């Protein structure tokens, strides 16, 4: 009787162990390969962007070739994922709505401190009629 119970228990436990092994090993491999594909794709995109940035700094860079090849490569890639991949967009630290509500005095003070050429104005006192942009007194105007 004891041997029969042991074999009956083994027949119940073995499929459970096989199922657990299937989920741990077989189901992990596609998830790891998709994550590796995504990381390789991200790394390749970063390299392409850095190359595009280096080419844009050159005066006679041909920008049509790399962009066409990049879109061609992206079209041939097939990524299996659970949803649509959303591209990462760099966002400002302050949301747009809050930025509109905030009073930025920097622009006004910057306009007062610098002229059109980026030179700092010195000696700017009260009236604009009396002194020019460089702090020199105006005569005869």
From Swiss-Prot:
Gene Ontology MF: a single term: neuropeptide hormone activity
GO biological process entries: adult feeding behavior; adult locomotory behavior; inter-male aggressive behavior; larval locomotory behavior; multicellular organismal response to stress; neuromuscular junction development; neuropeptide signaling pathway; positive regulation of cytosolic calcium ion concentration
Subcellular location: Secreted
Region (Disordered): 49-69
Sites bearing Sulfotyrosine, chain numbering: 117, 134
Keyword vocabulary terms for this entry: Amidation, Cleavage on pair of basic residues, Hormone, Neuropeptide, Secreted, Signal, Sulfation
Propeptide residue span(s): 32-73, 86-111
A GO CC annotation given for this chain: extracellular region
Modified-residue entries (Phenylalanine amide), positions: 82, 122, 139
Region forming the signal peptide: 1-31
Main localization, broad class: secreted
Highest taxon, organism lineage: Eukaryota
Assigned protein family: Belongs to the gastrin/cholecystokinin family.
Free-text function comment from the UniProt entry: Drosulfakinin-0 (DSK 0) plays diverse biological roles including regulating gut muscle contraction in adults but not in larvae.
Protein name: Drosulfakinins
Source organism per UniProt: Drosophila erecta (Fruit fly)
